[in-house]
Structure formats: structure tokens, C-alpha cells
């Protein structure tokens, strides 16, 4: 029924962007069903933006996934792609289901990235900060996620 569709797309841009962001951010190459991918110039630009994002980070997004926190609708959840052979060793996607912006200090397990001593973390691929790995190959990372939103981090 009507509640199960986001057509016309241009009237549901926020929801459509959330779907594109979740799918491409998780490295999902889906077969999209429906009459079209976009219905206006604005929706076409949105699709183009997220396809370009996926293409830019394809190598790491097509890599193995580690679940950081199980989604429960009560707090943040997230996944991390890891690839020790890639320049970008990890790609963290974090989601906030809450109506308020949140900041959390999380433990990020970096064992499967191949990193052993230090990691450089870039929020949305900007302004890298160096972290020393703990003995268990983890770092403590402060994350920020907007209300009902998403954020991502690159680890090199």
C-alpha cells in the first residue's frame, strides 16, 4: 500500500537518501526494483552523489564486515568494513535511531585491519587523527552522530 512506497521519490527525498546511504554505505550492490531510480533532477543528483560515494570507497566497502553494535533502536549501531590489503584499512558506518544527536566513546577492534601500532582516523575522510593501538589491537574512538542520522569514519 501507500505506506510501503516512497513514490514519488522527489516527495520522499529524506527517506530515499537514507535508503541509498544505508545500502551503498554497507557495500550493497542491489538490483533496485521499481519504475525508475530518479524522477526529478534533484533525485537524480541524490542518486549520482551516492553512486559516486560508493565508487570512491568501493574497495573497502566491498570488504569483510564486522558488526560493532547490534541495532536495537535504543542507541547507536554500526558496522565496520576491514581490508588489510587496502590503503583504507577500515570504513566505519554508525547510525543513530534517536531523536537527539549523540556522542559516544566506542571500542573499535582493529585486529583484522592488519594495523599493529597506530591508526589514523578520519571523520568523513577529513582531518586525520593518530591513535595508538591497545594490546588487543583496539582504539577508543569518540563518535558523533546527528539525530536520526549517520556518520562514517575512515581508518588508515
Would you name each region that the model predicts?
Residues 1-128, 142-144:
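Active-site-proximal substrate-binding groove within the catalytic cores of carbohydrate-active enzymes
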Residues 132-156:
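C-terminal beta-strand-rich structural cap/linker in extracellular carbohydrate-active enzymes
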Amino acid at each position: 500500500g501507500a505506506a510501503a512506497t516512497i513514490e514519488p521519490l522527489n516527495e520522499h527525498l529524506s527517506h530515499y537518501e537514507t535508503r541509498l546511504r544505508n545500502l551503498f554505505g554497507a557495500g550493497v550492490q542491489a538490483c533496485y526494483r521499481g519504475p525508475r531510480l530518479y524522477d526529478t533532477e534533484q533525485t537524480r543528483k541524490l542518486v549520482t552523489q551516492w553512486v559516486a560515494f560508493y565508487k570512491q570507497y568501493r574497495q573497502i566497502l566491498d570488504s569483510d564486515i564486522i558488526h560493532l553494535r547490534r541495532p536495537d533502536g535504543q542507541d547507536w549501531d554500526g558496522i565496520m568494513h576491514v581490508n588489510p590489503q587496502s590503503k583504507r584499512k577500515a570504513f566505519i558506518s554508525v547510525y543513530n535511531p534517536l531523536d537527539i544527536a549523540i556522542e559516544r566513546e566506542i571500542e573499535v577492534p582493529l585486529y583484522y585491519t592488519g594495523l599493529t601500532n597506530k591508526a589514523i582516523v578520519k571523520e568523513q575522510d577529513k582531518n586525520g587523527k593518530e591513535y595508538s593501538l591497545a594490546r588487543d589491537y583496539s582504539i577508543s574512538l569518540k563518535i558523533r552522530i546527528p539525530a536520526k542520522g549517520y556518520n562514517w569514519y575512515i581508518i588508515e
